[in-house]
Each structure stands twice: as structure tokens, then as C-alpha cells.
């Protein structure tokens, strides 16, 4: 059983692993800890800090204390620095004659070391132990989830409907081997983070006691490095191996980092063996991640892998209307349709375009109209018109499939030529404003019905053929960026 005086350094290590550096340094690190025989006092610098710690972190501190010490312990929050911490308990519980009162030492703000914070063994009054009271929002704070990312606020369309359906199943039944791990991939700004955090928020809502952690892959790497530097790696492993739900964003950042991949391999195995849920996002299909450990790539495919594709026109309009509604904006259908037609790449850029329009409207003191939108987004519209042309599409597709550019205009009908040509026609219909006859002319003088047939064929194949679906999405991303 751990002595009370050893509690605070271990508690600090756990908080540093859980919280952002700003949260840790602002609220937890400045606390002064005084350990007694049956209780622990934590001193905050002022009433505001005390109130915030009590509301957000007290229940977590109590949980850590019981976990570290092996028994429930009363945690008292008080106002005052080291001097108050040394004197207050003494007044309530006299010491033996001649025994000096050791002064508590606060965490040294200059070094940042986990071992910098120590506690004193000043006796505290024997206080009747009471069950810890849950702090409002304290548990959710430690998850690092954005409470705004919910299933209700997620717009659904063809591009993400499969991923959303799977996410709902996982949110209701985390740990189900059918969906474990859950691997979501797709281009930037398509809502992968929103989707997986919606799972986390749903699970937390159903079970606030669940140990949930959302973390970006780069932060996970930094946490590993810090754990090594502070010789707190056992604590790091114990924390991550004990989670009920782990959500890691942009896991492609692990590639080439051998130590990180090794440690994640063990954490991954520990969680799945314990029936816990692992959820990851990535910018590419697992087998296409260069520099990733083959053992991890194999394990990524154990559960369910789904792709999120760029939103189609109807979904883009719905996203804009929902965003406008959330911000109490009046947005006409014609305006939403125009923005959605011209900003096709991803959700992030779509919302960014709307913010620009709103800002332009406010600065110019004009209502949002089609003319105002065209003026506000003129550089985006010009860039889009410059970048996406049939010539550009043909060259990009030819390079991607490693065929000659001339094959786009030829009469060759072999599958390895015809299929890329059909893909290029479908992309031309989606990404340009050209008519079907004009697209046909650009592909060697073909009839508009040939273009229509190509578009229909590719649309059907994207539903049934994962390879075509991946190729098409990759080409969309290349052309839009």
C-alpha cells in the first residue's frame, strides 16, 4: 500500500498524461499538497482556482487517490500557499511536543518535472471518510472530447453514411469484436474527427464512469517521449492499458517512429484482449501507410475499416444550412447551392467559405446575397476555375493509372485503357461545369451518351468495388488540392 506522502507525485504524473500542458500547468501543478494520517489537503492559490479545481478535477483526484493508495481517502481543498498549508492542519490536530512542522513544497514551475512536486507528512485531523462526489464535467474534461461533436450535429450523406451507421453501432456496443478496431480513413477535412468524437461523447453520456481518451497521434508520440524523460513510463503504460475506449486521430503520424509503434502495439493488444474499443483515423487505407509496422497494419484490419468520401452536392448544401442554423444566420437556398457548387473539396473548406461570406457581409454592412457571395469568394472561384479543367483531369488520371495521355482520346477499348477513361469522364462531369457533349468532344469526339454511360458505370462501381472507390476518392482529392 502506497504511503500518503508518495501519492501526489504519482497523481501529477497521471494528470500530466491526461491533460493538455496548458490545463496541467494552470490548474494542477500549482496546487500544494499536505498529507496527514487519514486525509490529504490540497491548497489552491485563490478562491477562483479552488472553485475550478473542485468543479473540474476533484472527482478525478479522489479516483486517483483510491487507485494509488488502495483505499478511499478524504481530499480537502483549501485556499492558501505553502505557509497556510503548514499551519492550518496543526491548529486542528496538535503534534507531539518538539515535533517540527515540515513545510509542504509546491510543484516547481520552472522545471516541469513530474518528480518536482512533493508532499509533507503534516498530520491532518481525522475526518470521517465520505464517498467522493462526482465533479460536474470533471470526467469529461479528462477525455479531451469536444462536446460539440455529436451524432446530432453530424450531417449525413452518401460520403459518410456507412461510417456513421457503423459508428452508431460501436457507440451502443463498444468492444464488439465485429467493429474492433474501427479504422476510419479519408482526406483532410471530411469529418473523421467529428465522427469518432461523436462515438466518445455518446459512450460517455451512457456511462460517465468509462475511461475514455481522445488523442491526436502527434500528442501520443509526445506523451511517450515525456514519459521516458521523466522515467514515468510504467505510469504511462498503466494508464493507456486501462482505458475502456481509445480514440487516436491521424495515426499515419506513427509511421517511421519505431518506439511509438512498438508501445502502441502493446497497448493495442492489451485493450483488444480486454474487450476494450480502439478507434483510429487516417488519411489513407491501412495498407497504403508507408513506414508503418506490418504487425500494426495487420491488426488495423481485424475489425471494420470504412472510408469517408468528399460530400456530394446535396450533402454540402445540407452542411451549409445546418451551420447557418446553428449560428442563427439567414442563408438563402440559392446562396447555399452556389457555395456548395464551387467549394467541393471538404467540409472544413466549405465552413471556411461560409465564415468568409458572413465576415464580408458584416464588414460591408450588406445582407448575404448571391452577388455578395461572388465578391467574397472571388479568389476561391478563380482558383477553382484555373485548377480544374478537363485537360488537368485527363493528365492526372493518366498519370495515376500509368497510361498515355493520348489514350484518353484514342479508340482503344481494352479494360486497362477504357476504365481510366471512364473515371476521367465521371470526374469531368462532377468537377467542371462543362456539358456532356463538350466533355465527349474533349475525349476524342465521343457522343454525350458515351459520357453518360461512363458516369453511370463509375457511380455503380464506386458502390460495389472498393478499389474503384478508393481510386476515385484519391483522384478527387488530388484534383481539388
Curated annotation (Swiss-Prot):
Pfam family, one: Bac_DnaA
Region (Domain I, interacts with DnaA modulators): 1-71
Chain positions covered by the region annotation Disordered: 86-110
UniProt-annotated stretches for the region Domain III, AAA+ region: 144-361
Binding locations of ATP: 189, 191-193
Protein name stated in the entry: Chromosomal replication initiator protein DnaA
Taxonomic classification: Bacteria, Pseudomonadati, Pseudomonadota, Betaproteobacteria, Neisseriales
Keywords: ATP-binding, Cytoplasm, DNA replication, DNA-binding, Lipid-binding, Nucleotide-binding
Regions of compositional bias (Low complexity) in chain numbering: 86-96
Any single Gene Ontology cellular-component annotation: plasma membrane
Amino acid at each position: 500500500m502506497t504511503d500518503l506522502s508518495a501519492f501526489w507525485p504519482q497523481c501529477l504524473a497521471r494528470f500530466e498524461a491526461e491533460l493538455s500542458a496548458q490545463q496541467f500547468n494552470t490548474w494542477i501543478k500549482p496546487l500544494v499538497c499536505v498529507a496527514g494520517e487519514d486525509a490529504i489537503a490540497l491548497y489552491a492559490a485563490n478562491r477562483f482556482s479552488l472553485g475550478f479545481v473542485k468543479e473540474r478535477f476533484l472527482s478525478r483526484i479522489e479516483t486517483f487517490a483510491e487507485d494509488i493508495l488502495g483505499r478511499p481517502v478524504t481530499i480537502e481543498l483549501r485556499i492558501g500557499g505553502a505557509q497556510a498549508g503548514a499551519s492550518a492542519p496543526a491548529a486542528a490536530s496538535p503534534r507531539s511536543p518538539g515535533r517540527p512542522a515540515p513545510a509542504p513544497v509546491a510543484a516547481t514551475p520552472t522545471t516541469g518535472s513530474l518528480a518536482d512536486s512533493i508532499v509533507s507528512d503534516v498530520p491532518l485531523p481525522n475526518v470521517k471518510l465520505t464517498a467522493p462526489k462526482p465533479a460536474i464535467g470533471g470526467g469529461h474534461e479528462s477525455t479531451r472530447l469536444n462536446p460539440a461533436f455529436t451524432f446530432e450535429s453530424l450531417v449525413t450523406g452518401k460520403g459518410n453514411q456507412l461510417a456513421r451507421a457503423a459508428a452508431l453501432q460501436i457507440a451502443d456496443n463498444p468492444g464488439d469484436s465485429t467493429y474492433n478496431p474501427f479504422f476510419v480513413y479519408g482526406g483532410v477535412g471530411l469529418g473523421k474527427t467529428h465522427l469518432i468524437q461523436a462515438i466518445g461523447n455518446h459512450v460517455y453520456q451512457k456511462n460517465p464512469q468509462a475511461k475514455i481518451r481522445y488523442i491526436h497521434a502527434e500528442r501520443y508520440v509526445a506523451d511517450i517521449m515525456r514519459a521516458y524523460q521523466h522515467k514515468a513510463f510504467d505510469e504511462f503504460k498503466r494508464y493507456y492499458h486501462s482505458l475502456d475506449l481509445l480514440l487516436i486521430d491521424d495515426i499515419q503520424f506513427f509511421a517511421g517512429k519505431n518506439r511509438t509503434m512498438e508501445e502502441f502495439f502493446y497497448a493495442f493488444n492489451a485493450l483488444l484482449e480486454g474487450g476494450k474499443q480502439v478507434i483510429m483515423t487516417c488519411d489513407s487505407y491501412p495498407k497504403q501507410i508507408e513506414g508503418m509496422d506490418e504487425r500494426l497494419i495487420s491488426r488495423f484490419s481485424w475489425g471494420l475499416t470504412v472510408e469517408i468520401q468528399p460530400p456530394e452536392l446535396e450533402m454540402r448544401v445540407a452542411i451549409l444550412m445546418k451551420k447557418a442554423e446553428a449560428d442563427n444566420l439567414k442563408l438563402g437556398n440559392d446562396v447555399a447551392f452556389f457555395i456548395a457548387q464551387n467549394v467541393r473539396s471538404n467540409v472544413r473548406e466549405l465552413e471556411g467559405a461560409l465564415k468568409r461570406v458572413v465576415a464580408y457581409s458584416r464588414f460591408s454592412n450588406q445582407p448575404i446575397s448571391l452577388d455578395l457571395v461572388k465578391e467574397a469568394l472571388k479568389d476561391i472561384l478563380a482558383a477553382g476555375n484555373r485548377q480544374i479543367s478537363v485537360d488537368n483531369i485527363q493528365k492526372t488520371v493518366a498519370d495515376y493509372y500509368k497510361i498515355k495521355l493520348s489514350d484518353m482520346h484514342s479508340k482503344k477499348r481494352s479494360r486497362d485503357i477504357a476504365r481510366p477513361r471512364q473515371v476521367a469522364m465521371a470526374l469531368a462531369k462532377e468537377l467542371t461545369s462543362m456539358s456532356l457533349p463538350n466533355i465527349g468532344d474533349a475525349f476524342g469526339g465521343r457522343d454525350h451518351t458515351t459520357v453518360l454511360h461512363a458516369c453511370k458505370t463509375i457511380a455503380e462501381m464506386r458502390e460495389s468495388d472498393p478499389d474503384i472507390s478508393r481510386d476515385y476518392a484519391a483522384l478527387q482529392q488530388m484534383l481539388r488540392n
